[in-house]
Structure formats: structure tokens, C-alpha cells
């Protein structure tokens, strides 16, 4: 099991073209964040902070119920930490998703459901704003946004709250029998 360490550090690899996490002991983790997705501070070495470790733990706890192997859960949690800290600010792309209601605002780390006419998927809330949230896709099967665009495991998208529903509501809604 992967345990955060104060010896870890983030850096951008010109040869890989991606943000990397040095885990020590000659172990490296390549994130899914390429140069064009990163804020300026990602291009210098940055320590893995206490906040990063706290976020990693939060994401690990929330994704524990997902049908992923332990290495994939750790990978997703690290993708989430990297995106929350180093992803450039983006505008919502809510038009890819169906409206699911109003009044719902997720909390950081919470699993949410997004759907469209092609599929539905489970995402994890990374950065919650007043009206929209940056979230990461959590399935190994591609999520079709439209006929030509997809989201892959760990990729992020910002979406308005009216497109989201709570995964726990979907998974754990008790069945009720009508009796007379």
C-alpha cells in the first residue's frame, strides 16, 4: 500500500512531457497532466505537502468502494491530488452532460454521477466551486462525451452542479414496496 512521504516531490519532466511525482527509491509516478494543462508553478520542483497527503487520504477513502485494484485506486488518488494542485483553471463544459436537478453541491472527495445520452459514469469531486466542480473520471472504460470525444481514467472536467447527482443516492436508495 502506498503511504505518502515528506520525501516525495513533484516536478515537470521535459523528456516525458508530463508532471511527475518522485516517490524516492528510484520510483517515479507519471501523472496524466501534460504541459498545456499545468499552472506555471508546476514547472519547478515542489514538495509533496501536508495538504497533498491529506487530499490523497481523502480521495483514497472515498474511492475505496470503487471496483478497482489497489494499485489503480492509488493511481486515481494521485491523479486527483495532482489535478487539484496543478491543473490550470478551466471553464465548465456542462453541455456534454444531462441536467439532473438543482440544489445539489458535492463536497471535495465525494463520488458523483454524471450522465448523457451515450453513457453514465462515476466521478470524484476535486475542487468544489459555487456553481461548478472540477471532477475526475473514475472508470477504466472510456466515457463518451459525444461521438468523437472521450474522457479516460483519471482525466478531469469541470461541470455545473445541476448536471450532478450523488452516487450514494443512486447506489443506496432503499427499495420500497407498495402495500394496501
Swiss-Prot record:
The reply to whether Cytoplasm figures as a keyword in the UniProt entry is yes
Ranges that cross the membrane: none
Which residue windows are coiled coil? none
Top-level taxon in the UniProt lineage: Bacteria
InterPro entries reported for this sequence = ZapC, ZapC_C, ZapC_N
Record's keyword terms, sorted: Cell cycle, Cell division, Cytoplasm, Septation
| Gene Ontology biological process terms in this record | division septum assembly; FtsZ-dependent cytokinesis
Q: Name one GO cellular component term.
A: cytoplasm
Q: Where does the protein principally reside?
A: cytoplasm
Q: What subcellular locations does the record give?
A: Cytoplasm
Q: Name one Pfam family in it.
A: ZapC_N
What the protein does comes down to: Contributes to the efficiency of the cell division process by stabilizing the polymeric form of the cell division protein FtsZ. Acts by promoting interactions between FtsZ protofilaments and suppressing the GTPase activity of FtsZ.
Q: Which family does it belong to?
A: Belongs to the ZapC family.
Q: How does it assemble?
A: Interacts directly with FtsZ.
Descriptive protein name:
Cell division protein ZapC
Q: Which gene encodes it?
A: zapC
Amino acid at each position: 500500500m502506498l503511504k505518502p512521504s515528506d520525501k516525495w516531490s513533484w516536478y515537470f519532466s521535459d523528456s516525458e512531457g508530463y508532471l511527475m511525482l518522485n516517490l524516492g527509491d528510484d520510483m517515479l509516478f507519471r501523472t496524466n497532466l501534460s504541459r498545456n494543462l499545468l499552472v506555471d508553478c508546476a514547472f519547478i520542483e515542489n514538495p509533496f505537502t501536508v495538504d497533498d497527503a491529506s487530499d490523497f487520504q481523502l480521495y483514497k477513502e472515498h474511492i475505496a468502494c470503487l471496483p478497482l485494484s489497489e494499485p489503480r485506486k492509488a493511481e486515481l488518488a494521485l491523479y486527483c491530488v495532482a489535478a487539484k494542485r496543478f491543473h490550470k483553471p478551466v471553464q465548465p463544459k456542462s453541455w456534454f452532460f444531462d441536467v439532473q436537478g438543482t440544489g445539489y453541491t458535492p463536497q471535495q472527495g465525494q463520488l458523483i454521477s454524471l450522465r448523457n445520452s451515450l453513457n453514465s459514469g462515476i466521478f470524484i469531486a476535486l475542487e468544489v466551486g459555487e456553481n461548478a466542480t472540477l471532477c475526475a473520471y473514475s472508470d477504466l472504460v472510456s466515457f463518451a462525451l459525444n461521438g468523437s470525444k472521450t474522457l479516460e481514467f483519471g482525466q478531469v472536467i469541470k461541470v455545473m452542479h445541476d448536471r450532478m447527482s450523488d452516487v450514494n443516492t443512486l447506489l443506496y436508495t432503499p427499495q420500497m414496496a407498495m402495500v394496501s
